[in-house]
Amino acid sequence: MLMYSGEHAEEVEKDQAGTIRVVSGISDDHFLWKLCEGEEFMTPEVILAFTDNGLSELSLRFHRIIRENVCPKEFRDIKRQVLMNNWEGTYFDFDDDKIMDIADSAKEAGCEMLVLDDGWFGARYDDHAGLGDWVVNRNKLKKGMDAIADHVESLGMKFGLWFEPEMVNEDSDLYRAHPDWALTDPGRKPVMARDQLVLDMSRPEVIEYLYESISTVLRSAKISYIKWDFNRSLSNVFSRGLSADRQGEVAYRFVLGSYPAIQLYFRKKC
């Protein structure tokens, strides 16, 4: 098991003597690292396990390794709550009252958490605009995010909220202000998926923006859960924050930038 969240490759080879050789690591695609004199590069760790009791036992061993050594202890053993998510019930068409009505129904159904999905922020009335503008849409939620959270809490449930931090729409205030923050090839039409581009998570200023904007929302209401989405793969892997001879490092630096972005929300008080 490779301890890495980006593109990876595994090879298994058995030679004429019956010896099995396993190689696991970063994929050769989109990876070329310029290592200068005196610098170091650390490859991702690999976790190995062995059993002669079949795949089920091997899977259980990996589960135990991850639970006991990788999962943050403060979250590892907490009760996983039964939740209701509004997405397929409303898509982008909702307001305060509709979400509160759904919360009431969720309580009656025995749910323990309500998660407000995509569409609560920016000019987000469909999937063509607003992504990246992490500010509550007060035209939809006139009572504010805190009113919804308080209503859900009053029912004895927890409240969760949807984010997709790594993504941005061209039709957004963020992209209009910082088009260079998106991964795009100079001089080429960008490849879109779900009408969105991918932010360049290798850039510290992008991480700082995401932390500040999302933290402001999290501080505005009692939010107990984050649904962190990722609705497209990387393409046009080119960073305007790196020189031409270091573009092979972008995909790897993207992953390295994403890790602290996630940890900021759990290790620091918002």
Which sequence ranges carry the predicted segments?
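Aromatic- and glycine-enriched glycan-recognition loops and surfaces
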Residues: T90-R176, L183, E208-Y209, F254-L264
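N-terminal accessory beta-strand-rich subdomains and adjacent acidic, glycine-rich linkers
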Residues: M1-I66
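Core alpha/beta catalytic barrel or barrel-like domain that forms the active/cofactor pocket
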Residues: R76-Q81, E112-A123, W162-P165, Y225-N236
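An acidic-aromatic substrate-binding cleft motif
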Residues: R61-M113
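Active-site mouth loops of central-metabolism enzymes
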Residues: V22, N85-D101, A193-Y209
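Active-site neighborhood of glycoside hydrolase catalytic domains
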Residues: N137-S154, Y175-C270
